[in-house]
Amino acid sequence: QYSYEEGADMTIDEVLRRVDFSGVRLVEITGGEPLLQGEETIALINKLLEKGYEVLVETNGSMHIQEIDERVTVILDMKTPDSGMSHKMDFSNLESIKNSDEVKFVLCSRNDYEWSKEIISRYRLEERCKVLFSPAFGLLHPRDLASWILEDRLCVRLNIQLQKYIFHPGERMV
C-alpha cells in the first residue's frame, strides 16, 4: 500500500506555494516512497533547489537514487532482515551515498544489529556518510541497542523515533 490516508493531487506549483507560505527553508520529501512518483519528484526537488531551499529526500532504498541532485541530502532507510523487506533493497544505492547523506537502520533484534554491522563494513559507510541506528519501537529496547553500540565502539548515532514515544503508536500525527 502506498498511502494509508487519502491525499490530494497537487501540481508542483501548488506544492511550492504551500512551502513558500510555510516560511520554512528546510524541506524533507518522504512517503510512502517518494521516488515512485518518478520525474515529478525530481522536478519538485529541482524547483525547490532553484528557490534556495535545503532539500532532504528520505527513501526506502528500493528505487535508484542516482538521479537525485548532489545538493540534496539523501536519507536511505535500510531494510534489515527481521523487517521482512531487506530483499527489496537496491544495494547499488550504497555506492552512490555521499558525505552529506545518512543511512538509517531500524533494528528489530541482535540479528539485525549484526547484519547492519556487516553492511557498514562492506560498504565502508562509517567513512562515507552519517550512520543512524534506530531501535524498532516495541521490539528492541533502546538501552540494549545503546549497550551494543558502546561495546563495539561503532561510529553511529542512536536515533530514537520520538514520534513513537510522543504519540500513541497507532496515531498518524507526524
What residues fall within each predicted segment?
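Flexible, active-site-adjacent loop/turn segments at secondary-structure boundaries
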Residues: Y2, S92-E95, I160
